[in-house]
Swiss-Prot record:
Gene Ontology terms, MF aspect: 2'-deoxyadenosine deaminase activity; adenosine deaminase activity; zinc ion binding
Organism whose genome encodes this protein: Shewanella sp. (strain MR-4)
Catalytic activity as recorded in UniProt: adenosine + H2O + H(+) = inosine + NH4(+); 2'-deoxyadenosine + H2O + H(+) = 2'-deoxyinosine + NH4(+)
EC number: 3.5.4.4
Protein known as: Adenosine deaminase
Annotated positions binding Zn(2+): 12, 14, 197, 278
Aminoacyl-tRNA synthetase as UniProt keyword: no
Keyword Metal-binding: yes
Active site residues according to the UniProt entry: 200 (proton donor)
Length: 331
């Protein structure tokens, strides 16, 4: 199912959406934060999807618990370190971990730039202990408005040498991409690549805007592109990568079932598409789960799954020499 001669990557993976249940428990107790349960076992349903839950509101509440326990910068560093460990232990060769410093900072009023530094330090520490390649993507959380995104951008750009790209995430309908054109001009001027969450809650116009105005070369989710034949043609022709997260799309009710997921439609149209976990801590999944689902529910053949693996490497924010090194390590 997973081809061991091809690098296994996860490109759409939120660091702040992957906090271990026991870490939430320990940090909550360490910092005197009231948790919604009185044991580790009973905490799990409050912070992870159980069974067939498919509610965006419930999903976001679980996600909020993951940052609610980030009471100091040591907690942030620990979570970053554990993200590297989890990526390595799940069999990944390469992962791009994205994070929103504003979202991580806001509960306990941590300094935004301090959060960025703690994430970088935690990742560096993890890379000393685990064999996996990691790059970081900064997120601007549009839901908090333009001014908050400016703060976030400045904290991230102060450490741009540790980032490969910037992302725009959050409330796509309430805060459309055009509100952030100036922010992304600064990102382009800084020489960083751009990905954006688009076509998830909003229609294809959101994706056009992200590509043509923000400068995105990859799109997170993008499920609504399938309703716009011209966009599908454009995506295929220009090799705009779709970071697809099927289980997350089900959990957030972006799609009502795996059978309705448009992954196959993208593949048949020749669009560059990869499999990713999104918020693996909330969804209680790893990358191998997504490949199992792609085979059993999305009906992809082993040859198609191998192509999806290759797509991920092609889409990755890596230099050609780094890509070759990933392949060489699998030989």
């Amino acid at each position: 199912m997973i081809n061991t001669s091809i690098p296994l990557v996860d490109l759409h993976r939120h660091l702040d959406g992957n906090v271990r249940v026991n870490t939430i428990w320990e940090l909550g107790h360490q910092h005197g934060i009231a948790l919604p349960a009185d044991s580790l076992e009973t905490l799990a349903p409050f912070v992870q999807i159980q069974g067939k839950e498919t509610s965006l509101v419930a999903f976001l509440k679980k996600l909020d618990w993951m940052v609610a326990v980030l009471a100091d910068l040591d907690a942030v560093k620990r979570v970053a370190y554990e993200n590297v460990a989890d990526a390595a232990l799940s069999g990944l060769d390469y992962a791009e971990l994205r994070f929103s410093p504003y979202y991580m900072a806001m509960n306990h009023k941590l300094p935004i730039e301090g959060v960025v530094e703690a994430v970088i330090d935690g990742v560096k520490a993890g890379l000393k202990d685990y064999q996996v390649k990691i790059n970081l993507i900064g997120i601007m959380s549009r839901s908090f408005g333009q001014a908050a995104c400016t703060q976030e951008l400045e904290g991230l750009l102060a450490h741009k040498q540790h980032l490969v790209a910037m992302d725009l995430a959050g409330d796509e309908l309430g805060f459309p991409g055009e509100l952030f054109n100036e922010h992304f001009k600064r990102v382009r001027d800084a020489g960083l690549a751009i990905t954006a969450h688009a076509g998830e809650a909003a229609g294809s116009q959101s994706m056009w805007q992200a590509i043509q105005e923000l400068g995105a070369t990859r799109i997170g989710h993008g499920v609504n592109a399938i309703h716009d034949p011209k966009l599908m043609e454009y995506l295929a022709k220009h090799r705009i990568g779709i970071e697809s997260c099927p289980t997350s799309n089900l959990h957030t009710s972006t799609v009502s079932s795996y059978a309705e997921h448009p992954f196959r439609t993208f593949m048949d149209a020749g669009v560059l598409i990869s499999l990713n976990t999104d918020d693996p801590g909330v969804s209680a999944i790893d990358i191998k789960h997504e490949y199992r689902i792609a085979k059993s529910e999305l009906r992809l053949s082993d040859a198609e799954l191998a192509q999806v693996q290759r797509n991920g490497v092609e889409m990755a924010f890596l230099s050609e020499s780094e890509r070759k090194a990933l392949y060489a390590a699998k030989a």
